[in-house]
């Protein structure tokens, strides 16, 4: 059996899709379905069972036997960078993760988990997986940073794989439940469907992000599990691209429209990252050599998926 926490979420459901593609359906999905809209992410996928997150944690703490487990992909967390309830974040992103980590280490189960590029804070270069380059700017980033530090202390003594991925700007299928936290490509597509032009903040041609397609993220997770990889790694494309490039890819797909600019909000000016770019040196050294989709390639694929009902009519 394979366990995927946060399995109804964007990255979790794409990992399940990738597992299905290699013939694995013996999957226990763990999640909090308080947001019932997330159910749609697994409708076309195959799983064996579902367990509520709170019940799962209680079972983990109690030391319950889940049978033979081949791996745990821990994607369940509060992923909102605007959440400032520190107690809630630490319970969900830190304490929960520690319980799962020790459960896996004690039983020598491969443990693959979601970290975040938010651990780097507002830096503009040297996105390197080392403590000296990290300095989160929000409570979410701190919760992820603290767990990375915990893992670093445990790694030398572990006899099974522990692998964390600092996700950069992930976009792609199965994110519609995320609301305001969904990718810019998702929001721009919605604007186009309303008959509007895609809108970007003034200066967006200078705002560069490492946008990584979610299917590539899932692919790296499966590779790491299959190859027994340990450590903490950046997971982006290694190339920053502009929001303008995203908008142009959306326009190209729809075959109409032009970019409109809107004023940059004052309240974001002091805490808005103008640049992110994963340093992939460590991931490449670990053996991952496949290419990542560019923004143009990934956005085109995503637009086809998002608008599939329109293109099949």
UniProtKB/Swiss-Prot annotation:
Its EC number is 5.1.3.20. Substrate binds at residues 169, 180, 187, 201-204, 209, 272. It holds the Pfam family Epimerase. Pathway: Nucleotide-sugar biosynthesis; ADP-L-glycero-beta-D-manno-heptose biosynthesis; ADP-L-glycero-beta-D-manno-heptose from D-glycero-beta-D-manno-heptose 7-phosphate: step 4/4; Bacterial outer membrane biogenesis; LOS core biosynthesis. It catalyses: ADP-D-glycero-beta-D-manno-heptose = ADP-L-glycero-beta-D-manno-heptose. Its cofactor is NADP(+). One of its GO terms (molecular function) is NADP binding. Keywords: Carbohydrate metabolism, Isomerase, NADP. SUPFAM superfamilies: NAD(P)-binding Rossmann-fold domains (SSF51735). The active site is at residues 140, 178. NADP(+) binds at residues 10-11, 31-32, 38, 53, 75-79, 92, 144, 170, 178. It comes from the Bacteria. CDD domains: ADP_GME_SDR_e. The keyword Kinase does not apply. Catalyzes the interconversion between ADP-D-glycero-beta-D-manno-heptose and ADP-L-glycero-beta-D-manno-heptose via an epimerization at carbon 6 of the heptose. Belongs to the NAD(P)-dependent epimerase/dehydratase family. HldD subfamily. This is ADP-L-glycero-D-manno-heptose-6-epimerase. The gene is hldD.
């Amino acid at each position: 059996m394979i366990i995927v926490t946060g399995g109804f979420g964007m990255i979790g459901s794409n990992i399940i899709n990738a597992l299905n593609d290699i013939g694995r359906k013996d999957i226990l999905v763990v999640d909090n379905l308080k947001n019932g809209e997330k159910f749609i992410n697994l409708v076309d996928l195959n799983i064996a069972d579902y367990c509520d997150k709170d019940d799962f944690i209680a079972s983990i703490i109690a030391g319950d036997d889940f049978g033979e487990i081949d791996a745990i992909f821990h994607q369940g967390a509060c992923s909102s960078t605007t959440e400032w309830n520190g107690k809630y974040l630490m319970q969900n992103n830190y304490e929960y993760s520690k319980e799962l980590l020790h459960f896996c280490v004690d039983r020598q189960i491969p443990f693959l988990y979601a970290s975040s590029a938010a651990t780097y804070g507002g830096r503009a270069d040297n996105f390197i997986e080392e403590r000296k380059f990290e300095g989160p700017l929000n409570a979410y980033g701190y919760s992820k940073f603290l767990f990375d530090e915990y893992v670093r202390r445990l790694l030398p003594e572990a006899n099974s794989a522990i692998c964390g991925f600092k996700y950069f700007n992930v976009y792609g299928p199965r994110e519609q439940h995320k609301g305001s936290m969904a990718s810019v490509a998702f929001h721009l597509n919605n604007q186009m469907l309303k008959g509007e032009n895609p809108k970007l903040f003034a200066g967006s041609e200078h705002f560069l992000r490492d946008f990584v397609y979610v299917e590539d993220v899932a692919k790296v997770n499966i590779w790491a599990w299959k190859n027994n990889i340990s450590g903490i790694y950046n997971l982006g494309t290694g190339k920053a691209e502009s929001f303008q490039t995203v908008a142009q890819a959306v326009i190209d797909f729809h075959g109409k429209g032009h970019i409109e600019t809107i004023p940059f909000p004052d309240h974001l000016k002091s805490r808005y990252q103008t640049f992110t770019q994963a340093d992939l040196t460590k991931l490449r050294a670990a053996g991952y050599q496949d290419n990542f989709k560019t923004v143009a390639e990934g956005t085109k694929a995503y637009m086809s998926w998002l608008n599939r009902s329109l293109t099949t009519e």
